[in-house]
Amino acid sequence: MPKDKVVLHRHSAQIEFVPTSHGVGEKRIIATQTEVGKPITQIARTLLRAGEQVAMHIHPTMDEHFFFMGGECRVSIDNSTYNCVADDYLFIPAGCNHQIDVVKDTLMLTIGIEK
């Protein structure tokens, strides 16, 4: 394999839970830009608990991709609200205000990509 190529292989059970930057829920960071040398902020397996809320916020330079693996959330983006359940995908462009209200314990894959 060429020296400039990076292969990263992990099982999620080997990755410690850490608090989210919003102070709600917990996540296991699967990969970061530093590790893979690509313009991702992070790829994380995120767990949010029923009743939690990720307050309205904005990422000026980061697009977010959410893939819901279980549970239920209401995600408000600017003036629209989306009910998200298992197997749903949601893209939030950089610069959009968004908030997550957790209806049922939710497991999701979150991918942040710098613009």
Predicted regions and their residues:
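Ligand-binding loop in jelly-roll beta-barrel domains
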Residues: 94-115
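A short, N-terminal "cap"/entry segment at the start of jelly-roll beta-barrel domains
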Residues: 1-40, 55
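A cytosolic small-molecule/anion-sensing beta-strand core signal
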Residues: 69-70, 85-86, 104
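Structural motif
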Residues: 72-74, 81, 97, 107
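Conserved short histidine dyad/triad with adjacent acidic residue
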Residues: 31, 44-60
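Histidine-centered metal-chelating micro-motifs
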Residues: 53-55, 90, 94-99
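Short acidic-glycine-tyrosine-enriched beta hairpin
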Residues: 79-94
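Glycine- and acidic-residue-biased ligand/ion/polar-headgroup-sensing regions
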Residues: 61-73, 78
